[in-house]
Amino acid sequence: MLKTLNRRSWTCRQCIRILRRNAETRRYFQGASAASPLCQHTVSSSTSDKARDDQTLRLIFDSEPFWREFSQPKSSTSKRTGLLQNQYLTGPDGFLQFAQVSLQKCQKIVAKVIAASTLEDYRGMVRDLDRLSDLLCRVIDMAEFMKLNHPSPQIQDAATQAYALMFEYMNVLNTTPELDAQLKRASADLNVTSHWSPEEKVAARVLLKDFSQSAIHLPPKDRQKFVALSNEISQLGPMFVTNRQPETDHVTVDKNKLRGMDPSLIQQLQRWRKVAVPMFGDIPRIALYSVHDEETRKEIYVTSRTSSKVQIRRLETLLQKRAELAKLAGFPSYAHMTLSDKMAKTPEAVVNFLEALNASNRGQVQDELSQLLALKQADVPSATQLQPWDHAYYVHQYSARHSRVRRSRESTLLPAFFSIGTVIQGLSRLFTRLYGIRLVPTETLPGEIWNPDVRRLDVVDESDRRLAVIYCDLFTRPYKSPNPTHFTLRGSREISQAEIAECADLSSSLHPNDGMATTIKPETNKLYQLPTVALICDFDQSESRSTPSLLNEHNLETLFHEMGHAVHSVLARTDLQTISGTRCATDFVELPSVIMENFATAPEVLALYARHWETNEPLPEHMVKSMELNRQSRVSMHGGMDNEVQILMALLDQAYHSSRPLEPNFDSTRIYHDVYSTHSSLPDPPGSRTSWQGYFAHLVGYGATYYSYLFDRAIANKVWSDVFKGGELSTNRDAGERFKNEVLRWGGGRDGWNCVAGLLGNNPANDNGKLAEGGEEAMREVGRWGLGLMGTSEL
């Protein structure tokens, strides 16, 4: 998952994740060296040093004694650096200072852009606005990250204040039409645009699109209404997410009706001979897969999928406000407004994709349901069809009867081969083979990290030049979010000579990247801020920490997924921050992370790293085969239905963000039943008036874009099959370079369809390069590719 900021962002449309950093650091077992803050950092390229780095990478995560020694300062300096080596963030007061200094720089840039009149001014305008975007992101992203992840309440409060100051200023920019007018003037002048680089032209289009979506072109009265609607929407969203509740809190049934359910759980819920089954939390799910009595399952199913009327009103108000906002901005619907800068472009194209995908998935669904119906008929010979409240129950029954591998001793031994250190080591080895980069464990300076458990990894290339910095905060702790997330802390960007001079004029101690990581590109001799990212996970540790943290298969794929986002940030080292790293179309950004899930368990990749944490023995071949058979068994029994559930949610999302919310008798429940009765293999019974949509929290964060994850899964399935040959080329350098050069290195600087077309080349699916144009037929073609055996977890 990428962290998405819920803010309008003409400057950082895809500030879709959060944050950044620098200053020279020292390596383990090496003394500190006095390095210029602007000099390029390199590490030793000797074979022995690389082997030591590889071993150290594993040990800093797996060995607590080794980590304690490694993380001890190797010099006597008592001076503390700032968080992420940001020179302002040495304490809570530094957040406001950082925001104020950045704000002053922003104001100067805005004044310069508004006053622009010469060709030289207009030719430099995109870079000026990109720097404005970067200055805003530096503060907002950093503050948002620390607000969510720093354990100190004082730091959290200070970060909140800094965030509020810059967010308020961003709202001022969103009501400054002169910026939009000046950029339009520059973009319309061939004497200007002929001097722009391809990146500058893309960034200009992105910025103009963001201006249009903030309704900056509207008359003042309409613009005020747009801001008011936006504020209402921003308040309704969290209210909808945090108030999901059923219309009826409990279903009361006789104890004997719950046979099959865990007796200890029944006892907790029992009152005399009756049991009050709550309709929230995990209990309904547990009941649906374990209770033998069909009528009881039906009652629990229907009741648990019926939202409170208040919650439905909240949703309908939210959808109506979004539709009004889009209409005010000149779009037919909220979906049209949201999708205009995505690969899909239109809601019609999204529906084409989803219907084609549903058709390609239907055969598997019917096979699954036929097997489950046979199980039901063994229990109830007169049964002629499977009901929606039967599905979980008979999947569970099938698993209990057939999935011996799951219950075998062998499956319980698998995590011992996937310690976190072993997996990180494997990721580094994989990246070396695919992209010629590796992860180097690096000592942090006092004050640099927000928690003692955070590890810093530098990413270096084959010339041992540093490319990026990754902070790994992977272990659970009190009050930490359980959601795995990739945060962009600072994106790639060229730092101009003017910025360097500006810092020197202000103070000899100031750094043009606030003290965070920089490098000099040898090809151009220009200074760049390095991509800096954080990976947040919530993996358990043993209480004594005497044994390493071991990952099950789900957590293994999660770590590979998040590292897929990270490598996208690392390799998309653009000149402009606006299009750096993961700042690309929402329906393209998950491709690198989704495809990484396939690498996690590919036999060729497992051979690189899967070793027992204690004996160092490689994962036996028969266990590799068992993993694959178990995965195929899961997918063959409910993978198709899992896919259909996601497809239906995406179709419902499109229906809700059409123009229908503006109709006088808009009824979200009727639309829900229309969509499901048309497309579902197991629709809710007619007349049930279930209203599951009240639980659909992703409507808030992914309004009109819920299809994106499915879309990227379909593309990833095709790429894995055709480029990486289903895993045969999963460690092949040519295949890796192809993926890097056609997809990863561009960030948001190349249209996603061109990336896909370039990647597939002469593949029949891309006959005559037809995918490069995108459009409704291209969306339908991707739907035909299907989802394969890839992960089926939702967003």
UniProtKB/Swiss-Prot annotation:
Its EC number is 3.4.24.59. Disulfide bonds: none annotated. The keyword Disulfide bond does not apply. The active site is at residue 562. Keywords: Hydrolase, Metal-binding, Metalloprotease, Mitochondrion, Protease, Transit peptide, Zinc. Zn(2+) binds at residues 561, 565, 568. Binds 1 zinc ion. Its main location: mitochondrion. GO terms for cellular component: mitochondrial matrix. It catalyses: Release of an N-terminal octapeptide as second stage of processing of some proteins imported into the mitochondrion. PROSITE patterns: ZINC_PROTEASE. One of its GO terms (molecular function) is metalloendopeptidase activity. Belongs to the peptidase M3 family. Cleaves proteins, imported into the mitochondrion, to their mature size. While most mitochondrial precursor proteins are processed to the mature form in one step by mitochondrial processing peptidase (MPP), the sequential cleavage by MIP of an octapeptide after initial processing by MPP is a required step for a subgroup of nuclear-encoded precursor proteins destined for the matrix or the inner membrane. This is Mitochondrial intermediate peptidase. It comes from Coccidioides immitis (strain RS). The lineage of its organism: Eukaryota, Fungi, Dikarya, Ascomycota, Pezizomycotina.
